[in-house]
Amino acid sequence: MRKYSNIIAAYSIMLVLILLVGIFQSWSIALTILNYCLISAVMTIGANIQWGYAGLINFGIMGYTALGGLAVVLVSVDPVQQAWQAGGLNILICFWIIVVMVVLIRYFLKYFNKYTYRTYGIAFVIIGGILLLRLTATPGIEAIEAVDPAKTGFLGGMGLPVLFSWIGGAFLAGGLAFIVGKIALGLRADYLAIATLLIAEIVVSIIKHEEWLARGVKNVIGLKRPAPYEIDLQTSQWFINLVEKFHSKKLSMINSITERQDALSQFVIDASSVYVKLCFTGLFLSVVIVLLIVTQKALYSPWGRKM
C-alpha cells in the first residue's frame, strides 16, 4: 500500500492545483490544463511501455504525434475535387510505383542468394523507382498546389467523422513503429536513440514540406471536431434554458430586465466554453482509461512478462 501512497499524493496535489485554478482564475483555463494533462498522459503511457518496461530508448515520439495530426486531415477533411482532377492520378500512380518497388525489393531479398546480383538488383530498383517517382509526382504536385493555394492546395481527406481519425492515427503510428522496429531494434541503445530521433525528424519534415498532402505548415480551414461549437451552443434554446436555471439565484437578484439579459448572455458565453471543454475532457479521459486497461492487460500477458 505504501508504494501507492506517493502516487495518490501526487495526483491529489495536481487535482487540488487544477481546482484552485478554476476557483481563482477560470474553469475554462482549469479544464484546458486538465485536457493537456490527459493528452500528455496518452503519450506518457506509450513512452513508459517502451522505455520504462522494455528499456527501448525512443526519442521519436514527436514523429508519431505528427502522424496523429496528419490522420485528422486525411480522414476528416472533405476531398478537394479540383485538386484530385488536377493531379490526383499522378499521386495514385506514384503510390503503385512504390508498391511495385517494395515487391521487387522483397523478391530480390528472398530469391537472390548471391550478394552481388542482389545488391545490383535492389540498387537498380531503388534508383529507377526514384526517377519514375520524380517524373510522375512533380507535375502532379505542382498542379495540386496551384488549386486555390490560399484555402486548399492539397488533396483533402475522406470526409469521415473526426473520431475515426483517432483510429487512423493509431494505425499510422503503429505502421511507422513496425517499420522503425524492423530497421532499428537491433541497434545499441545510443544508436537506437539517434535512429528514432532521425526517423521522427524525417516524418515531421515530410509533413511540413509536402503541402499537397496536408498543406504543410499552413492552416487547414474547417476541421471537424467531436464537440459542438461554442457559437452554436450560445444560440441553442435548450442550452440557454439550462444556464438560466443553473444561475437562477444570481439572475433573480437583478431587477433590471436589460441587465438581467446582459448577465444571462455573459453566463451563456462562459458556460459554452466550459461545456465544450468538458466534452473533450470526457473523450480524452475515455481514451486514457481504455489505454490503461489495455496496457495493463498487455503488461501481464506472456509478451509483457518477457519485457
Stretches found by the model and what they are:
Residues 1-306:
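Transmembrane alpha-helices and adjacent helix-loop boundaries
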